[in-house]
Amino acid sequence: MNPILIIAGTNRPSSNAARIATVIQSTYHRRGTAAEVYSLAEMPASVFSPGAYAAKPPEWIEVQDRVVRSAGLHVVVPEYNGSFPGVLKHFIDMLKFPESFERKPVAFVGEAAGQWGALRAVEQPEG
C-alpha cells in the first residue's frame, strides 16, 4: 500500500509543524500504516520561479509524484496572521490537478499558539 504523505505546511526551518508531522508519522507507524513526512522547507527553489507554473522544474516532478502516489494526505497547517502560510498555497498550486487530490482522503491539523488553535488556518484550505 502506498504511504500517507504528511505535509509540514511551512518552509520555516525547525518549525513546530515539522515536529507535529513527525509525531503524526509515529502514530501512523504504531498502527501499522505506512507514512512519510514532507516538509515545505524541502521545496526546491526553482518552484518559486515565475516560469515554474508553465513548465514544472525537474526537481519538482519527484515531489509531485509522491503526492499523486500517496494513499492520502495529512497536512499540518500553522496559522500565520489568521490564515495559512502562503508557501502552502504555492505548494498546492504547483501540484497536478485533479490527480493529486481526486478520490484521496485529506486531513488537516491546525497548529497555533492563540486561543482559536488555527481554526481559520484549517478552514480556509478546506473550502
Language-model segments: what does each one mean?
Residues 1-97:
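N-terminal beta1-alpha1-beta2 submodule of the flavodoxin-like/Rossmannoid cofactor-binding fold
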Residues 98-102:
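Short, conserved loop/helix-junction motifs that constitute active-site signature segments
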Residues 104-127:
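Short, glycine-/small-residue-rich phosphate/pyrophosphate-handling segment
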